[in-house]
């Protein structure tokens, strides 16, 4: 029993240390407090987190255009939950601009991270959107 609890705690800890969870948190903080400077504490994923956060923020207009052009009938960004929108934007940034990471890895990592922030039905919706979009953005992956 104790071994099982220890394993479960470590499993949760390792999931919680996912760099994509940190990306989502940083983007949410930026959305809620746009004037605040974004802090990137030292970690093995610091460069990755900084690249994705800055890239998502800098290219948010382009990402929004991508969503509108590929998913106009599937999603209304004005009515989309803020956290879902943040996760979607970060994942699309990676799909469009981080070609060194396979699309399946990007999607599965954001779906895992989304479990901390979204309801199960929203995670399913996110999965469908990312799957559809990834097929259009990365045909050769």
Please report, for each region that a protein language model flagged, where it lies by residue.
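N-terminal interaction/assembly modules
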Residues: 1-116, 122, 127-141
């Amino acid at each position: 029993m104790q071994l099982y609890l220890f394993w479960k705690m470590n499993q949760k800890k390792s999931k919680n240390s996912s760099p994509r969870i940190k990306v989502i948190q940083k983007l949410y903080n930026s959305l809620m407090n746009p004037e605040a400077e974004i802090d990137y504490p030292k970690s093995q994923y610091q460069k990755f987190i900084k690249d994705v956060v800055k890239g998502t923020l800098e290219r948010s207009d382009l990402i929004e255009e991508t969503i509108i052009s590929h998913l106009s009938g599937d999603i209304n960004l004005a009515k989309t939950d803020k956290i879902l929108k943040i996760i979607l934007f970060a994942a699309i940034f990676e799909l469009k601009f981080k070609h060194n990471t396979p699309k399946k890895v990007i999607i599965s990592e954001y779906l895992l991270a989304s479990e901390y922030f979204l309801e199960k039905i929203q995670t399913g919706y996110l999965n469908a959107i990312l799957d559809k979009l990834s097929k259009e953005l990365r045909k050769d992956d």
